[in-house]
Amino acid sequence: MNIVFLDRDTLSPQTRLRTPGFAHTLTSHGRTALHEVAARIADADIVLVNKVRLDATALAAAPRLRCIAVAATGTDTIDLAACRARGITVSNIRHYAVHTVPEHTFALIFALRRSICAYRDAVQAGRWQAAQQFCFFD
């Protein structure tokens, strides 16, 4: 089984990939330009991808391809209709960041409501230190 990762550098170096429980070869490319895709996946059974676009033309160059694993939540870079027509399974990381995205959203709401960025800028500019009283009112 031939596995090709087209853009390994889009993941953190600390991210460890699980070793499949079957005989395989893994070829990892740091990045892949669009003109390199067809040649790199020509003999692939499985393609791992994050940001590289896989369109019908690229997929046609990979007759053995049976699975595309997207290392992200979105599949907008994959021609899903072409995959369906060729019997290629596409999987992605579902439920990724289901807690962190809403937490970050609320953190941004609070930061906006309390003018955190404006106060940070004022402190960095020395305005708090120059205030006549201990509290800094703006």
Segments (PLM) and residue ranges:
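Structural motif corresponding to alpha-helix initiation and N-cap regions
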Residues: S12, R31-V37, V52-A56, T77, ...
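N-terminal glycine-/charge-rich "phosphate-binding" loop or analogous flexible N-terminal tail
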Residues: M1-A44
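Phosphate-binding beta-alpha-beta segment of Rossmann-like dinucleotide-binding domains, i.e.
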Residues: R94-D138
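Short beta->alpha connector loops at strand-helix junctions that form conserved
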Residues: G30, N50, A71-A72, I88-H99
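A short, aliphatic-rich alpha-helical micro-motif
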Residues: R40-I41, L59-A62
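Rossmann-fold NAD(P)-binding glycine/threonine-rich loop
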Residues: D76-I88
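Short gly/ser/thr-rich secondary-structure transition/capping motifs
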Residues: L26-T32, V49-K51, Q124-C135
